[in-house]
């Protein structure tokens, strides 16, 4: 696991234990099972008019960039991004480094119809049950921070609750691991988690290794119409785009430009 992942997970453990004390796992699981089924995340990740589907990411900050959007209004953003053509939304719920909140996702679930991905650093079944309870259609599992056995366990648990899983890989070994464990949505993150640098050629190389029948997602580095088209040429069905949108004066206008609508 990279240094930043270790740091983030260490800070989240105490918070997770407090959440478990307030709402025990059994109760959270019942909430998850009682929650209404939302739109399918996987089904939404289909190309439209030649463009990869856009998973628009709502985040106020990141470890690499600091505060990206000081005037962060998630209740307004989710609706604006849906109307601008987002196929799905990725909602950061990690509090310390991304300044996210589970409440942002829960609120978005009442305002939009497109599927919601819980973007967090997930290593415990509780987080998955909570995601389902607050309105997520999918969760992110990061190969770099999970053993193959743990990945497989969490993947199966998410599927048992009707959640899709975006399985994130940074290299060939991680990609092979998630595919061997049944991943049907494979995401490639070309960010070096030690230096925070981006190398989009990593995305292009790894996406071509994902077999047919598995949804292919470019998870980082799409910062222009040109890189979106490069992702498409490499076989991407979808692209997750956050910083480009959140740093724009109008995220909705920026999304329309990305899709070639403006």
Regions found by a protein language model. Give the residues of each.
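C-terminal helical cap(s) of enzyme catalytic domains, especially alpha/beta-barrels
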Residues: 205-209, 232, 245-262
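Glycine/Thr-rich beta-alpha phosphate-binding loop at enzyme active sites
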Residues: 58-71, 80-99, 176-205
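Catalytic-face loop-and-helix region of soluble metabolic enzyme cores
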Residues: 185-241
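Active-site mouth loops of central-metabolism enzymes
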Residues: 55-73, 114-123, 164-169, 217-222
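Conserved anion-binding
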Residues: 113, 117-201, 208, 212
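Catalytic cores of alpha/beta
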Residues: 123-134, 170-181, 218, 222-241, ...
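N-terminal small/glycine-rich loop or linker at the start of catalytic domains
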Residues: 44-66, 101-108, 152, 204-212
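An N-cap/entry alpha-helix motif that binds or orients negatively charged groups
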Residues: 2-69
């Amino acid at each position: 696991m990279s240094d930043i992942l270790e740091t983030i997970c260490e800070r989240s453990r105490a918070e997770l234990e407090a959440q478990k004390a307030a709402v025990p796992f059994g109760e959270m699981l019942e909430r998850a099972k009682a929650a209404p089924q939302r739109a399918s995340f996987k089904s939404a990740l289909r190309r439209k008019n030649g463009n990869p589907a856009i998973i628009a990411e709502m985040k106020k900050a990141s470890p690499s960039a600091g505060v990206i959007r000081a005037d962060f209004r998630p209740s307004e953003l989710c609706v604006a991004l849906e109307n601008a053509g987002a196929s799905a939304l990725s909602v950061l719920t990690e509090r310390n480094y991304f300044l996210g909140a589970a409440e942002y996702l829960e609120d978005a679930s009442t305002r939009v119809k497109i599927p919601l991905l819980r973007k967090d650093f997930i290593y415990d079944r509780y987080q998955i049950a909570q995601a389902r309870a607050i309105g997520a259609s999918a969760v992110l599992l990061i190969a770099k921070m999970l053993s193959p056995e743990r990945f497989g366990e969490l993947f199966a648990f998410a599927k048992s609750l009707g959640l899709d899983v975006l399985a994130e890989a940074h290299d060939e070994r991680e990609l092979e691991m998630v595919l061997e464990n049944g991943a049907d949505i494979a995401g490639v993150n070309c960010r070096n988690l030690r230096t925070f640098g981006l190398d989009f050629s990593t995305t292009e190389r790894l996406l071509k290794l994902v077999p047919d029948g598995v949804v292919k997602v470019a998870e980082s580095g799409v910062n222009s119409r040109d890189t979106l088209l490069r992702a498409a040429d490499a076989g991407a069905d979808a692209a997750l785009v956050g910083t480009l949108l959140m740093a724009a004066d109008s995220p909705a206008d920026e999304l329309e430009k990305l899709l070639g609508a403006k």
